[in-house]
Amino acid sequence: MATLAACGLIDLGKLAQDGVRVRASAGATSYRRRATLEEHLAQARDVVEQLKREVDDDPAASNQRIGAARQRAARERVERVDAALAKLREVEAQRERRLKTNRKQAEKQKEPRVSTTDPEVRILKMADGGFRPAWNGQVISAAGTSIVAGVTPCAEGSDRGLIRPILDKLRTRFGRLPERHLADGGFTAANDIEWAHGEGIEVYCPPTQSKHGGDPCQPRAGDGPGVLAWRSRMASQEGKRQYRSRAICECIHARWRNWNLIRFNVRGQAKVAAVMLWHALANNILQADRMLRGHRITTA
């Protein structure tokens, strides 16, 4: 990326952000409510204790090895259910916070469930309208190119509110923030736009249409200085011109789909992030080679 930036082929001051949903390595039937998880945890602990007694009582070495393997599998089951219960507590805490801000919507939701296969993954709405265990992979790219600057798998079902946390991670990595940041309408969040304005970042994402059918670019009561500047920016021809370069980031997702990134074969956010990073590296190697060869031809 440093070489491409030095050649003027990419501009790290202008980034695009988009999300791609990829099926997780967890079954829809692996999701359990609190009562079921606690029951499974008690059963798993009973199995561990029973297997310990069997291994101690059986003097045969081969049978001991088989028993030890079964015992290890039972311990791993206990660990997974324990992790699921810990994750469930986080989900329940999030629901309690939502009750304070949007009580009607929170009350409509069913009792939270967590997967015993991969407690970190949530059920998300997919592009085909179905609901399946999946990761919301956030991809940051140099706007107007297919060069990936960063990847982060998230469990959030909505892109709203993900601009700030992703850019904070990018600042940790590169030591800087972009001057302009492009994202689709699903990322539009007043808090993120105000934060970006305070950091000197111009956000380009389409404003959401109001339920009354008014012009979404017109100022509204309660708008802060950052949101006011953003609405004015998106109403201008220059703002629309800048935003058009965001569309190219969709090509990255299409390329990864062609590489069969349909479903992750690993579990846990850290391992999923590693798979996404390998795809990003492969993507950047191919795209950088193409861009540098074109640059040499034009400068020859």
Task: For each feature predicted by the language model, list its residue ranges.
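Anion-binding and metal-coordination hotspots
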Residues: 1-300
